[in-house]
C-alpha cells in the first residue's frame, strides 16, 4: 500500500491526520501554553524562592536558554535558504535530523527552570512531548518524498537525540545572509522570554505584584 492510498479512516491515516493537525497548529498551541505560564507568573510566586533551590534552577535555566540560542543560530547558519530545496546533512544536521527541535527543548526546559517552578516546567515539557514527535514525523515524511537520499540519511542519523560520533563539518559553507538575518529573530526569542520571566520575579520581590498562589 502506498502512502497516497492510505484511507483517512485507516489507523495510519488517522495518525497522519493527527500529526498534520498538530504540526499546523503548534504555534497556536504554544501561544496558549505561554499565556498560561505568564498568567501563573503574574499571580503566583515560587515556593523555592529564598532557598538554595532558587539559584540552582536559575543557573540551569540560563544555561538551557543560552545553549538553545547558540544552537539555533548554529542550525540557522546551515539551513537558512536551503530548508525546502536542499537536504542538509552536515554541521548540526550530522548529529541528528532535527537539531532545531533539540535546541527548542533545551530552551523550553531552561525557561521552565527560570520560573523556579517544577510544575510550570512539567507543563512546558508535556506540551513539547505531545506535539513535537508529530512534527518530526510530518517533516520526515516531507523530506522522504522530496529527497531520494533521505532514506540513507535517516538510516544512519538519529531523529532527535544527537550522536556526537557522527559529527561532520564543512571547511567552507555559503550562508544565505538575508534568510539568516530573518532567522536570527526566531533564534533569540528564548532570550526575550527569559527577560520577561525574570521581570515577573523582580516585580514580585519589589512588591509591585502580589502573589495569590504558590507555584510548586
From Swiss-Prot:
InterPro entries attached to this UniProt entry: Phopholipid_MeTrfase
Endpoints of the signal sequence: none
Bilayer topology term: Multi-pass membrane protein
Descriptive protein name: Cobalt-zinc-cadmium resistance protein CzcN
Pfam families assigned to the protein according to its UniProt record, in alphabetical order: PEMT (PF04191)
Transmembrane is among the record's keywords: yes
BP term (GO), one: response to cadmium ion
Source species: Cupriavidus metallidurans (strain ATCC 43123 / DSM 2839 / NBRC 102507 / CH34)
Gene Ontology molecular functions: transferase activity
Localization annotation: Cell inner membrane
Keywords for the protein's UniProt record, in alphabetical order: Cadmium resistance, Cell inner membrane, Cell membrane, Cobalt, Membrane, Plasmid, Transmembrane, Transmembrane helix, Transport, Zinc
Function (record text): Component of the CZC cation-efflux system that confers resistance to cobalt, zinc and cadmium.
One GO location term (cellular component): plasma membrane
